[in-house]
Amino acid sequence: MDLFEYQAKELFAKHEVPTSAGRVTDTVAGAREIAEEIGKPVMVKAQVKVGGRGKAGGVKYSADADAAQANAEAILGLDIKGHVVKKLLVAEASDIAEEYYISFLLDRTNRTYLAMCSVEGGVEIEVTAEENPDALAKIPVDAVKGVDLAFARSIAEAGKLPAEVLDAAAVTIQKLWEVFINEDALLVEVNPLVRTPDDQILALDGKVTLDENAAFRQPGHEAFEDKDATDPLELKAKENDLNYVKLDGEVGIIGNGAGLVMSTLDVVAYAGEKHGGVKPANFLDIGGGASAEVMANGLDVILNDAQVKSVFVNVFGGITACDAVANGIVGALKTLGDEANKPLVVRLDGNNVEEGRRILAEAAHPLVTVVGTMDEAADKAAELAFAAK
């Protein structure tokens, strides 16, 4: 989960990372009020989860409250690379002597953590890495030893930060490591990490990506979720503990097991080439259990997608036998009632498949078509979706 800058700075404050004073607002009047409270020049900064805000006019220096108000009016509602600005961070402007770069992230290739540091901050780090790779130090971090002050200082030295700020930078780097580890982050990045004229070190910007798989041990992270930006279907699926990803096609997919669902996406995409180019509408893995409740929740999500024209239920019975799956489908259709209004193509295989097919045949629901093989089912689902377009 990517955080807004103001949310990243909330985590920074929690771990005593030095940064500039400020607050977030979603109104022009609020921006003026914050600027008046600070009583000094401020930066009015668009809160969007995308880079290039400054070049797009989303970051403005404001000498006083009047300027902050005018800049807030200009920035709120601005479209920055497809992201509409709905919130602003109004923060005290800082005197900057130099700009640096620091980040912690996962090094998936070497299966460890990585620190990156550079004396050249304030620009896109990809540019630095491409044009002047020697200026970007990459330092592996031992997952057991972590980052103490001495190691944090060595990171700053590797990044060629000036000697007179190494101690102050080390303190900040060590605290950023605490954010990275204690908050279960996948990325903590500060660009720029600035040196003020009196040799203070401040994190003027912040980018944090949290590991959503660690949410169970980070209950406070739920407050960071941007529900306004989350697709409502994905939000509904998450509330029901369903593994769901919305795609842009017309054939809804339900399966048990990620591998089977991925294979189903492939066969539907292939079948769709013969039926007007229809494509899978989603990834939805209901896991090992296919109770009536789980199936109903899955169908409820998919059937509420206006793009979906047909649904392909592809289940291989293992620990959960096919008769239980079939009962789940029948129960789900009863639960949904009139909301179940799109054709379902069901393919069952595996444990107790004959009984599962018998249950579906006996129920004789007018929207359900039972098909023997995955290829045949994909073809039928694609055909029905194309006919309904």
From Swiss-Prot:
GO CC annotation terms, alphabetical: cytosol; succinate-CoA ligase complex
Transmembrane segments: none
Keyword Metal-binding set for record: yes
Reactions performed catalytically: succinate + ATP + CoA = succinyl-CoA + ADP + phosphate; GTP + succinate + CoA = succinyl-CoA + GDP + phosphate
Keyword ATP-binding on entry: yes
Cofactor binding notes: Binds 1 Mg(2+) ion per subunit.
EC class: ligase
Superkingdom of the organism of origin: Bacteria
HAMAP family xref list: Succ_CoA_beta
Protein name per the record: Succinate--CoA ligase [ADP-forming] subunit beta
Source organism of the structure: Rhodococcus jostii (strain RHA1)
